[in-house]
Amino acid sequence: MNSVAIALAICTAGAVAEVLAAGTGVRERFAELCLPRHSPPLEVWVAVGILYYAVCFIVAYRLLRGSWNPVRSLPLALLLVLMTANALWNYLFFRRKALGASAAAFVPYTILAFVLFVSLLGVDRVASRAFFLYLVYLFYAAWWLFALRRANTTSERAA
């Protein structure tokens, strides 16, 4: 099997896991939350998800291409764990509606993403640059998630 097909299979499996973990009430979940200022609409979040999987594909492809090198094992394993953790976050946020748990899970997720980035630096420059874009996005995601939690904790207390 070639590296493009394997990378595509990895990303497809990750996307399917994410959709299954989130469940069917994604739009309703967004509607019931008090969103922070500067929150994009759900369609933009879908586009962000597509870009996330494009980055994951680039990273997976770059790690899988050519003859196998054991040095690529760690970043590839970290990528798979990160994609699994992303599905877990969707489960906590959408299906369980556990805003506090999803915020708590975001902390080790971000650390894992940073460790993946560092591991990519010594292995593949293109993959590390592509993944760096995702790390930049995570700063906004962190602000948004914690602002969301604050807004909804405050609105729950006021009710």
At which residue positions do the language-model features occur?
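Membrane-helix boundary connector in multi-pass membrane proteins
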Residues: 91-99, 115-129
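Helix-adjacent hinge/juxtasegments
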Residues: 54, 58-90
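Interfacial helix-start motif at the membrane-water boundary
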Residues: 38-54
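Hydrophobic alpha-helical membrane segments
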Residues: 80-89, 102-116
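Cytosolic, membrane-interface loops and tails of multi-pass inner-membrane proteins
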Residues: 24-40, 149-159
